[in-house]
Amino acid sequence: MTRTNLITGFLGSGKTTSILHLLAHKDPNEKWAVLVNEFGEVGIDGALLADSGALLKEIPGGCMCCVNGLPMQVGLNTLLRQGKPDRLLIEPTGLGHPKQILDLLTAPVYEPWIDLRATLCILDPRLLLDEKSASNENFRDQLAAADIIVANKSDRTTPESEQALQRWWQQNGGDRQLIHSEHGKVDGHLLDLPRRNLAELPASAAHSHQHVVKKGLAALSLPEHQRWRRSLNSGQGYQACGWIFDADTVFDTIGILEWARLAPVERVKGVLRIPEGLVRINRQGDDLHIETQNVAPPDSRIELISSSEADWNALQSALLKLRLATTA
């Protein structure tokens, strides 16, 4: 059986960073797999996890539970039966509702395959002070479904956010665990703790299944001879706009960082080619984290998520102007 953990968390909480940390510190003799779902369609998390050494399946452009769970079932079955991993980490979109996923993982058909362990919810406590986030049904249900709450980004904690966290915990913590971390440094031993929270979760009223699964199990890619493309996705009060550029497109380093910093959106995530190699960009609100490597990525991908109308055409125009002379 494959030890399995659901790693939830709202937009920008640090799920992918936490998973990368767990993968970097796992037993080298074990085979791990990651099933990742993103709200947008360009597959940024897949690009970030590509060098982790884990088996990887992506379900971009929506939610794992659409169409009676078919996209997730296909990805799950592929990883379990072909990959036969020792451990499986499942990362749903930050706008995802955990009930359908947990229902599927505990279905009788998966009893011989899955040993479901603790569900971790990665939380940025500052979101408890943000009315839009704190009132979001999926945000609340992610916290309600967790066995362990990981209060991430301790280095960014304010007295107000810590007080909000303690108030929430007194009202909702129960006998669950509350762990503090920064930069996604989650102790891997937490993954082997058992499920404790068996409370029945409500179905999500906000999550209608009327949207169409357009891309199946493949992240957006470029057709041959096409230099770049854009993709839009929307749902649950948010919009995502992402771009993919071919391997020969190189961006101005300072320009792309300023573009990402100033974009009037809540979330920016990307892996792009620059003259020095590649840059990974991760922005949530005003928090901007960048990381560079002196290797070129196979392509460039960047995605923005906004809770309000954004002028994607204007943002795209500015982005295209940041391309340097290509290497082709």
Curated annotation (Swiss-Prot):
Domain of life, per lineage: Bacteria
Motif (CXCC motif): 63-66
Regulation of activity: GTPase activity is enhanced by Zn(2+) binding.
Null allele phenotype: Deletion of the gene increases the sensitivity of E.coli to the metal chelator EDTA and sensitivity to cadmium.
A GO cellular component annotation in the UniProt record: cytoplasm
A family per Pfam: CobW_C
Residues holding GTP: G9, F10, L11, G12, S13, G14, K15, T16, T17, D155
Enzyme Commission (EC) number: 3.6.5.-
Catalytic reactions on record: GTP + H2O = GDP + phosphate + H(+)
Keywords from the named record: Chaperone, GTP-binding, Hydrolase, Metal-binding, Nucleotide-binding, Zinc
Residues covered by the CobW C-terminal domain: 241-321
Gene Ontology molecular function, alphabetical: GTP binding; GTPase activity; zinc ion binding
Purpose of the protein: Zinc chaperone that directly transfers zinc cofactor to target proteins, thereby activating them. Zinc is transferred from the CXCC motif in the GTPase domain to the zinc binding site in target proteins in a process requiring GTP hydrolysis.
Assembly with partners or alone: Oligomerizes in the presence of Zn(2+).
Similarity comment: family membership: Belongs to the SIMIBI class G3E GTPase family. ZNG1 subfamily.
Name by which UniProt lists this protein: Zinc chaperone YeiR
Gene encoding the protein: yeiR
